[in-house]
Amino acid sequence: MRNFDLSPLMRQWIGFDKLANALQNAGESQSFPPYNIEKSDDNHYRITLALAGFRQEDLEILLEGTRLSVKGTPEQPKEEKKWLHQGLMNQPFSLSFTLAENMEVSGATFVNGLLHIDLIRNEPEPIAAQRIAISERPALNS
């Protein structure tokens, strides 16, 4: 697997390094699970994954630095089924997203087969200039 970190070049994007994720997954045609990235306002985002057939116990979310990883390991049926048509995927998966420096995960919920991961951008306060008084006597005695 190839890893490219282009996040320093793309800080103006919405908090996600889409190009780096695309390059990292080049050659791996990962289309499961489908997901959306929603922007509520300049500081609030939501990642939603469609996970029909998964249980909350099957899912794991990890945040390591700026890398958000979501893994799913569904419980396998005890007996093999004979499918006439199988359109719903129920397979293990691993997805990762690169977050911008000031992004934080504010919470996650799993409702009706949809995993929602809420993100907040916390912009640091700018450091105010500090005025230094100038005295007439020397600061160091020599």
Curated annotation (Swiss-Prot):
Pfam families: HSP20 (PF00011). The N- and C-terminal flexible termini are involved in oligomerization and in the binding of non-native substrate proteins, and are essential for chaperone activity. Residues 26-137 form the sHSP domain. It comes from Escherichia coli O7:K1 (strain IAI39 / ExPEC). Keywords: Chaperone, Cytoplasm, Stress response. Gene3D superfamilies: 2.60.40.790. GO terms for biological process: protein stabilization. Belongs to the small heat shock protein (HSP20) family. CDD domains: ACD_IbpA-B_like (cd06470). Associates with aggregated proteins, together with IbpA, to stabilize and protect them from irreversible denaturation and extensive proteolysis during heat shock and oxidative stress. Aggregated proteins bound to the IbpAB complex are more efficiently refolded and reactivated by the ATP-dependent chaperone systems ClpB and DnaK/DnaJ/GrpE. Its activity is ATP-independent. InterPro entries: A-crystallin/Hsp20_dom, ACD_IbpA/B, HSP20-like_chaperone, HSP20_IbpB. Homodimer. Forms homomultimers of about 100-150 subunits at optimal growth temperatures. Conformation changes to oligomers at high temperatures or high ionic concentrations. The decrease in size of the multimers is accompanied by an increase in chaperone activity. It is found in: Cytoplasm. This is Small heat shock protein IbpB. The keyword tRNA processing does not apply. The gene is ibpB. GO terms for cellular component: cytoplasm. The lineage of its organism: Bacteria, Pseudomonadati, Pseudomonadota, Gammaproteobacteria, Enterobacterales.
